[in-house]
Amino acid sequence: INLDGVALEPSYTNVDGGRWVSNNPATLQRFFKQLLADDSLTDEQRRALANERVRLLRDSAEESALPALPFPADSHAQAFRDYLAGIDAFYRGDFSNAETPFLALKQSSQPWVAETAQYMLFRIALNQIVEDAVDDMGMFDRTKSNKAAAALALERGDEYLSSFPAGQYVNSVQGLYRRINWYTGDYNALAFNGEKAISQATTPEALQSVINELDARLLGNQYLKPPFIGEPNSPQVTFTQVLKRLRENYQTQTTATQVTAEELAG
């Protein structure tokens, strides 16, 4: 396997929160494990598939060698090959050509490929939400979010969670629901899903991550018009926001939304 040029740490584009975030050495290793665990693959097929995945991690301009390889039709080797073609298109931002193989691979007899294909369909729709909403400077304009893509992403996420309730991407899908809420300005849903994530956090790091996210995007976001006051089905988040609004430095702001007696009465 040719590992020349593979960085031990993710590149800048791998940590900016975009579609490249999953193209890193950790996912490369997980892919290798799937190749090793699949007894139907020959050593030659494993090497070819592994080298292609390395090429994608290097973001190399070299042409893929996979199309010339004679993988048997409907074999697991072909499923892995088609999966790699899909993620190649995905990381290049060619979402229409990424979607085609993943739609077919949902029915694959290779279980890891079938599950991952369904997850990738969710991520394709997620990225399509903001495909035309980010300018050349990286600034996000929520008014240009693709609402149809957002609805499709939620539909595909629900489909994944229904098909794989204990799947390997459950936490990712649930977390990305909050990103969809933010992309579309559905702040009540963001509060609800954020409070749910707080209750499900199993480590201090996970809890801190959700709290920081809610504070930046919702509770402490001064650019929300109108500002977030509360959400009936999210009592903890609502109570936290009331406490913040009761602070003296907030109450004296000309743009402050004053806490009412009715709110305090519950």
How would you describe each model-predicted region?
Residues I1-L103, V113-G266:
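Extracytoplasmic/secretory-pathway proteins
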